[in-house]
């Protein structure tokens, strides 16, 4: 629901968000009241000492004050449980209760201060009583400090400008005035988001690229949230409902409704070859990671010992290692890949915004020069990811609409300049002129690898790219079709990154609004049931995802409840409009042909990948046009999880080579 309006400004807190914090405070206050009452009843006869009257008065007033606070907090919790997310009517008294509760902090602070002052006088009373009162004073200040921290977290810097959110532009304003007002609001929102991003990334250097990335990221966030009035708990409830709704639809689907496709023998043979290639090249993708990550991903304990030996004493004879002063990262690469010094042409750990680490190595087994690009491992990489505007690419190919993700395109362009202008590829092919060029990467590195292959194809027509878990919002339609000839993308399970794009995020926002508007359960029940369902499973029919009268089709229609969660920013606003529907954020696609590793059966809610069974199949990009919500949406993106899944798929397919019937079922 819309954020509450208190003291004339909007806060990032809804009136139904106080069930859990209120219950926790209620539990704490009741225990505190019981302990204080017990202390007073058991030791009141010992309060006839000098200063004991002050302590007795302190305890009596504290008990009365706690009783009043307990009553108010209980009322807040009960009122917060009423209604639904889109029906705040039963909670209209919440603001008055909060004003009373906040007013009670004043006598509580005064009494805690007096208690501290009286105890500090060195009153000569029973030691147990004094310690008990000191404890109550400490608890009082802890509760007050926690409340102040909570207020800071729920404070909305834009609340004074945008509270309450207007349902529409005031009618007395002409178009120029309304445009001026909206421009001011957007500028303020972007400024707030830019400050937030800078605070989160305060430890990285400030150069021109970083400042541009800050601006792009702030523009994306401010634009995305500009037409909604949701608080964080609403989004969490929406995720919970979408997860259960997905499972409910999946469970209710008849077997005949599941579309399967059995490819012809040439396609299946090609799939086997490409899966084997992915299995071979995937370990190259994360090798540019910092050495602690490689140690964590390695099952060999000696890697730590070997890495430390390299860090302490060995001088690397190569001058091709860049940005690794103590050679720890390079030592981990040697152990994880099993390659020799002579196989490395160039290793760069240089990491800045729009500038990614990469390696160039000779792969003698596949007779290829491998360029591996690192994925997201730093705040600089996150800023590169979030620079989601599109920009035109200047390519020597006859294609129209050559547009790509701005941040990833600039990162690919940086690596291209290093490879070509610095002669790194020329050096590699002077050593092995008969080898072919292969570009690989994972996550952010996958997107950069695909774009790098597109840029290099004019000079290296035989280039191949393997993009592991690439972001969806990468290429325009024409570049997507063009890349199918030489780029293969591998996606595991419910991985969220290959489904992540500006368009998909906008679709996710609309789905959240609709499922919230359709749900007739209070938010606290949604969150409780959702946590239980995510951890322990169960039937989604038992949870609050059902629509009134079971009408699933209603989710496609705008609802009154949905409209209450939208901020209409112009007189011409309608529910289908979006501030992200602009040339700055066109629809973008993933790179190349897609191999999807699907989990067969289940391995538990958070099951280990080694216990799961997977099948590989060719997939269409439209299958990844919607973000799926589930426990594995992040786990399936991890490189080590993908490597183990590939190990299992390759082992199963190899074992079934002599079993055509079983092998065919592995490729729907």
Curated annotation (Swiss-Prot):
Its EC number is 3.1.1.116, 3.1.1.3. The active site is at residues 443, 495. Residues 1-17, 80-102, 150-668 are cytoplasmic. One of its GO terms (biological process) is regulation of inflammatory response. The chain crosses the membrane at residues 18-38, 59-79, 103-123, 129-149. Expressed in corticostriatal and hippocampal slices. Highly expressed in striatal neurons (at protein level). It is a multi-pass membrane protein. The modification Phosphoserine is found at residues 570, 578, 582. The keyword Zinc does not apply. Inhibited by the 1,2,3-triazole urea covalent inhibitors KT109 and KT172. Inhibited by p-hydroxy-mercuri-benzoate and HgCl(2), but not by PMSF. Also inhibited by RHC80267, a drug that blocks 2-AG formation. Keywords: Calcium, Cell membrane, Hydrolase, Lipid degradation, Lipid metabolism, Membrane, Metal-binding, Phosphoprotein, Transmembrane, Transmembrane helix. InterPro entries: AB_hydrolase_fold, DAG_Lipase-Related, Fungal_lipase-type. One of its GO terms (cellular component) is plasma membrane. It catalyses: a 1,2-diacyl-sn-glycerol + H2O = a 2-acylglycerol + a fatty acid + H(+); 1-octadecanoyl-2-(5Z,8Z,11Z,14Z-eicosatetraenoyl)-sn-glycerol + H2O = 2-(5Z,8Z,11Z,14Z-eicosatetraenoyl)-glycerol + octadecanoate + H(+); 1,2-di-(9Z-octadecenoyl)-sn-glycerol + H2O = 2-(9Z-octadecenoyl)-glycerol + (9Z)-octadecenoate + H(+); 1-(9Z-octadecenoyl)-2-(5Z,8Z,11Z,14Z-eicosatetraenoyl)-sn-glycerol + H2O = 2-(5Z,8Z,11Z,14Z-eicosatetraenoyl)-glycerol + (9Z)-octadecenoate + H(+). Its cofactor is Ca(2+). CDD domains: Lipase_3. Residues 39-58, 124-128 are extracellular. It is found in: Cell membrane. Lipase that catalyzes the hydrolysis of arachidonic acid (AA)-esterified diacylglycerols (DAGs) to produce the principal endocannabinoid, 2-arachidonoylglycerol (2-AG) which can be further cleaved by downstream enzymes to release arachidonic acid (AA) for cyclooxygenase (COX)-mediated eicosanoid production. Preferentially hydrolyzes DAGs at the sn-1 position in a calcium-dependent manner and has negligible activity against other lipids including monoacylglycerols and phospholipids. Belongs to the AB hydrolase superfamily. Lipase family. This is Diacylglycerol lipase-beta. The lineage of its organism: Eukaryota, Metazoa, Chordata, Craniata, Vertebrata.
């Amino acid at each position: 629901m819309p954020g509450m309006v208190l003291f004339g400004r909007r806060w990032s807190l809804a009136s139904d968000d106080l069930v859990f914090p209120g219950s926790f405070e209620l539990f704490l206050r009741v225990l505190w009241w019981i302990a204080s009452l017990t202390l007073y009843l058991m030791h009141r006869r010992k309060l006839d000492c000098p200063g004991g009257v002050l302590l007795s008065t302190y305890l009596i007033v504290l008990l009365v004050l706690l009783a009043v606070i307990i009553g108010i907090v209980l009322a807040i919790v009960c009122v917060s449980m009423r209604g639904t997310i889109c029906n705040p009517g039963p909670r209209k008294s919440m603001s008055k209760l909060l004003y009373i509760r906040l007013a009670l902090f004043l006598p509580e602070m005064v009494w805690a201060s007096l208690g501290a002052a009286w105890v500090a006088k060195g009153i000569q009373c029973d030691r147990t009583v004094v310690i008990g009162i000191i404890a109550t004073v400490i608890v009082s200040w802890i509760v007050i400090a926690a409340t102040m921290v909570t207020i800071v977290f729920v404070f909305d810097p834009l609340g004074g400008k945008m509270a309450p959110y207007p349902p529409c532009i005031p009618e007395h304003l002409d178009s120029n005035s309304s445009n001026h007002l909206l421009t001011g609001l957007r500028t303020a929102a972007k400024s707030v988001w830019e400050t937030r991003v800078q605070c989160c990334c305060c430890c990285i250097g400030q150069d021109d690229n970083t400042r541009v990335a800050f601006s792009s990221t702030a523009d994306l966030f401010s634009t995305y949230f500009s037409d909604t009035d949701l608080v964080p708990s609403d989004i969490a409830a929406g995720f919970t409902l979408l997860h259960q709704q997905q499972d409910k639809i999946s469970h209710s689907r008849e077997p005949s409704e599941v579309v399967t496709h059995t490819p012809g023998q040439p396609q299946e043979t090609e799939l086997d070859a490409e899966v084997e290639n992915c299995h071979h090249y995937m370990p190259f993708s994360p090798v540019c990671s910092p050495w602690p990550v490689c140690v964590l991903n390695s099952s060999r304990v000696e890697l730590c010992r070997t890495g430390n030996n390299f860090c302490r004493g060995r001088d690397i004879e190569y001058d091709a290692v860049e940005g690794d002063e103590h050679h720890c990262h390079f030592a981990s690469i040697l152990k994880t890949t099993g390659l020799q010094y002579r196989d490395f042409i160039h290793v760069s750990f240089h990491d800045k915004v729009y500038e990614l680490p990469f390696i160039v190595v000779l792969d003698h087994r596949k007779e290829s020069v491998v360029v591996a690009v690192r994925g997201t491992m730093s705040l600089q990489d996150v800023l590169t990811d979030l620079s989601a505007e599109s920009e035109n690419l200047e390519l020597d190919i006859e294609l129209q609409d050559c547009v790509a993700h701005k941040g990833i395109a600039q990162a690919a362009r940086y690596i291209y300049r290093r490879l070509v202008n610095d002669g790194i590829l020329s050096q590699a092919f002077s050593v092995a002129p008969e080898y072919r060029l292969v570009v690989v990467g994972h996550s952010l590195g996958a997107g950069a690898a695909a774009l790098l292959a597109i840029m290099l194809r004019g000079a290296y027509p035989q280039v191949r790219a393997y993009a592991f878990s690439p972001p969806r919002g990468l290429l325009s339609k024409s570049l997507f079709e063009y890349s199918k000839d030489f780029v293969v993308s591998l996606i595991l399970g419910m991985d969220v990154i290959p489904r992540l794009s500006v368009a998909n995020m906008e679709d996710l926002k609309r789905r959240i609004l609709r499922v919230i508007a359709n749900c007739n359960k209070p938010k606290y029940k949604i969150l409780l049931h959702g946590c239980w369902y995510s951890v322990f499973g169960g039937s989604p029919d038992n949870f609050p995802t059902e629509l009134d009268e079971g009408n699933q089709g209603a989710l496609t229609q705008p609802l009154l409840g949905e409209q209450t969660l939208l901020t209409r920013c112009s007189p011409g606003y309608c529910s289908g409009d979006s501030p992200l529907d602009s040339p700055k954020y066109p629809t973008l696609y993933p790179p190349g042909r897609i191999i999807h590793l699907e989990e067969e059966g289940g391995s538990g809610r958070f099951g280990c990948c080694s216990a799961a069974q997977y099948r590989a199949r060719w997939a269409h990009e439209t299958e990844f046009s919607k973000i799926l919500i589930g426990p594995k949406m992040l786990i399936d993106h991890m490189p080590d999880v993908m490597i183990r899944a590939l190990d299992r798929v390759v082992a199963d397919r190899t074992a079934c080579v002599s079993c055509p019937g079983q092998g065919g079922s592995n490729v729907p």
